[in-house]
Each structure stands twice: as structure tokens, then as C-alpha cells.
């Protein structure tokens, strides 16, 4: 089974994850989505209850609900810690949080940013170093501002990256139903 973890509090592509996951589940890929946040986040009711009423006959949504909400404590990094503790090879993590991405990549998970950028074992070290440098420069007042605004192109890149990750993991044998 493929497990997708969404670092959901500020994630702009939650709806895209639901659509892609539902499409792959209807094709027989065994997967589960965990929407992890510090406060309750709305998710499509039909995906939480075990599948939409118009789902193809025989679609099991991995034996139950396709999407599960997880509300963690309000403390700093609670959602990150919950995800990092569970992420492993065969899982996909959706996050823009570079330290969380680093922890999940080290655990063997596929990690994708909402703009479609893949974090890999080869790239995460430099990405983390750049993030830490920029954080230091911002703290010193040398740099103001933040990342570029989220654009439609970012959404398209994310959709392609997520679809590719699910296909790659399915081909590696992770998308098969267990039991």
C-alpha cells in the first residue's frame, strides 16, 4: 500500500491530492491519504466515509476510507513529528517544510513540495543548507520577503510529480493491496 501524508496546515494542493488519489484508487492502486494538521481541516466527506457513491463497482479504497484526518496538538512541529515518525519507503509526503522533507527523505519516502519540486537524497542536503542560510539572512535583516506566490504552473507541476511518484511506487510493488 502507498501512504500519502499531507502536511496540511498551509498546503495549497490538498484538493489535487484527493483527486489524484481517488483516480488511482479507482484503478486498483492500494493507497491511503493522511491529512495531518494542527487544527481541523475539511476533507471531502465521500472520501472519508469509504468512497464516493458513484465509485466503480469493486473499488475498495484500500479496504476503507481513502482519506483520514489527523489533528495533532497545537505545539510547534507536532504535525511534522507525526509525519516523520511514520514516513518510510513506499510513502509519499507532500510538504513545503524543508526540515520535514529532509527527515522523510532520510527515512526513504518520496517527498514532493506543493510546487512539484521533488526532494531527493541527492538534493536535500543543498536544499536544507540553502534554507538555513536564507533563514539566517532574514533573521539578520539582510533579506526581506518570502517565496514567490503560488502560480497555476506550480499546480500543474505538482500534479505531474504526484502522478509520477504514485506510478513509480506502484511499479516498485508498493501499490498492491495487502491481506
For each feature predicted by the language model, list its residue ranges.
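Nuclease catalytic cores that cleave nucleic-acid phosphodiester bonds
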Residues: 2-179
Amino acid at each position: 500500500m502507498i501512504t500519502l501524508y499531507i502536511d496540511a496546515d498551509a498546503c495549497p494542493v490538498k484538493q489535487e491530492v484527493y483527486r489524484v488519489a481517488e483516480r488511482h484508487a479507482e484503478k486498483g492502486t492500494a493507497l491511503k491519504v493522511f491529512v495531518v494538521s494542527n487544527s481541523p481541516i475539511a476533507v471531502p466527506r465521500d472520501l472519508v466515509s469509504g468512497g464516493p457513491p458513484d465509485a466503480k463497482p469493486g473499488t475498495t479504497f484500500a479496504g476503507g476510507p481513502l482519506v483520514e484526518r489527523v489533528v495533532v496538538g497545537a505545539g510547534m512541529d507536532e504535525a511534522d513529528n507525526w509525519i516523520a515518525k511514520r514516513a518510510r519507503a513506499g510513502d509519499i509526503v507532500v510538504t513545503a517544510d524543508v526540515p520535514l522533507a529532509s527527515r522523510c527523505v532520510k527515512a526513504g519516502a518520496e517527498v514532493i513540495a506543493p510546487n512539484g519540486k521533488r526532494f531527493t537524497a541527492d538534493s536535500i542536503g543543498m536544499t536544507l543548507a540553502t534554507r538555513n542560510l536564507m533563514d539566517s539572512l532574514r533573521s539578520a535583516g539582510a533579506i526581506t520577503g518570502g517565496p514567490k506566490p503560488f502560480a497555476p504552473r506550480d499546480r500543474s507541476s505538482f500534479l505531474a510529480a504526484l502522478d509520477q511518484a504514485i506510478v513509480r511506487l506502484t511499479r516498485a510493488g508498493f501499490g498492491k493491496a495487502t491481506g
